[in-house]
Each structure stands twice: as C-alpha cells, then as structure tokens.
Amino acid sequence: MRRPGAAERFGMKILQINTVYGEGSTGGIVRDLHDLCADRGIACVSAYRGPAKGRTAPEDTVAVSSVWDGRIHGQWSRFTMFKGTGSLLKTARFLRWVDGYAPDVIHLHNLHGSYINLPLLFEYIKKRGIPVVWTLHDCWAFTAICPHFAMIGCEKWKSGCRDCPQKKRFSSAPVDLSGPVWRAKKAWFTGVPQLTVVTPSRWLGRLAGESFLGAYPRETIPNGVDLDIFTGTESDFRARYALEGKKLVLGVAFAWTDAKGLDVFQALARRLPEDYRIVLVGTDDRVDRTLPPRILSIHKTADRRQLAEIY
C-alpha cells in the first residue's frame, strides 16, 4: 500500500474513494479529477477496490481490497443483501493508512462495489470529523439495494424499503431483508458532521433531497467534459460504417440494459424513417443478439478519442 510521499508537500490533501479508477464512467471521472488536482498542485490520492489480477495500481492510488477479498465480500453481499459489510481486515488496514495520509477532504463516489466496509468507514469519518463531499452517480446511497427505481415506479425508499420488488435482480438472499438494510444504511450515512452531497443532475439532487440524505447540503455539478478531446474532430466514422447521408441517433452507455433505455432504442428503430440510423456505443455480444438490423452496435471502448470521433 502506498505511503504518503512527495505529493504531500502541497497544502491541501484530498482522498477520493470509488469502486474503480480509470475505467467506466465513474472511474473516468475519478481519474480526471485526480489529474486536475495534480495539474493545480493539489495532493490527491485515489483509493479503489484495486487492480485486476496481473495489473499494477497506477501512481498515487491505493488498493483498498484485493481480488479474492472482493469475491468473498461480493458473495456475502448477494446472500445477505448487506452490501458493504465485508472486507473488515482490508478496510481496517486502509483506515490506518488514511490516518497517516491525514486528508483535508474525503471525496466519496460509488461505495457499492463490495470492496470496503461501510460501517467502519463512516464510523471513522464521524470520529475524525473530516469534511466529506459525496458525489452520487446513482440512487444506491439512499435505497436498500437498488441503484435505480424509476423503471418500476417504486417510492418505498422515501420512508423505508420493504418487500423489495427488485430483490431477485440484485440479491440471492433467501428472505427479503430490504427493511433492515435500509435502516442500517440510514444509520451509517446520516450524522456526518461535515458532508455535502453532490449530484450531476438536478433530478438526482431532488431525489436525494427526498431521502434520508435530505438533511445534508446539496450541490448540482454536471459531469465535466475534456474540451481538449471532445472538440471539433475530423472523422471518417460515417464513411466507415456507410452512414453518409443518414440522420444519426446516438446512445452511449457503459452497460446497456432496459434501465439505461435499451428497450426504448429497440422500439425507436422500428418506428424511425429509413433515412435514420441508431448508433449504440458501449454494447457487447449479449446486447448484439437483441438488436434489430437498423441499430449499429459499437462495443465498449475506453478510448475517449474514438468516442470524440463518433460524437
């Protein structure tokens, strides 16, 4: 595990915590914020569940968990519904490191990747009184087990989850423990002395305000865009895929499901005129098997310049 070093010569020290680093949507956001801090002379360390087997952690990052610990924690979470209650030893070790680093601000992101013990983490934060910014990328922080509920119109999270309609999707537990899980999360996540909730949209901010996180101050900060990459870009994308003269409808997601609107694009493909084509980025072989011919599928990519060419 990385020890405090030369970067800490600067004044403010920030610690970010997220499931992943440098991959996927939230991992890219964490990496970009990490790099922005470095450019501005602010010390920043990003903690995440750890690199995949055979890979090494990037500089100025900390692996909270390990591959095997994550698997055990994940299975425990699936069968008990209590995500974030494993990884006791790994989290205790990580928090000893945090004491040595002594961050001025902790920036939380996604905590639901079966890599960190949430009761230990929040007990530590409350005792130390460290200011916290918590950026919510979905709704998991204020529900029992689900990251999204709009599809099914569930509002039980406002007063207390119970009889979870998405239990089979997110848990293998033999009984529904969504009520105790929701109450536990409320106890863990409330009562932090200095915590600000940040959301990338007003919609998510409104939902957070209606939840048990509503007592905290909230800010809406849209996700940033790297204008050095996402700018006017020469591209042969249309010619490469025989799309010249077509009107394009573009959809981009890290993992396509009906919750991300996959079913809407499938229905749209059947209704649009012939001079339209739909392009979905972030697909995989499983999604490909469900797509009609008029949808162009482009598999997941971590190459932001390729994305800029498509845009």
Regions found by a protein language model. Give the residues of each.
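Nucleotide-sugar donor-binding and catalytic loop/hinge architecture
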Residues: 8-12, 234-249
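A conserved catalytic-core segment of Leloir-type glycosyltransferases
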Residues: 39-105
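Acidic anion/phosphate-binding donor-loop and adjacent secondary structure
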Residues: 206-209, 225-240, 288-290
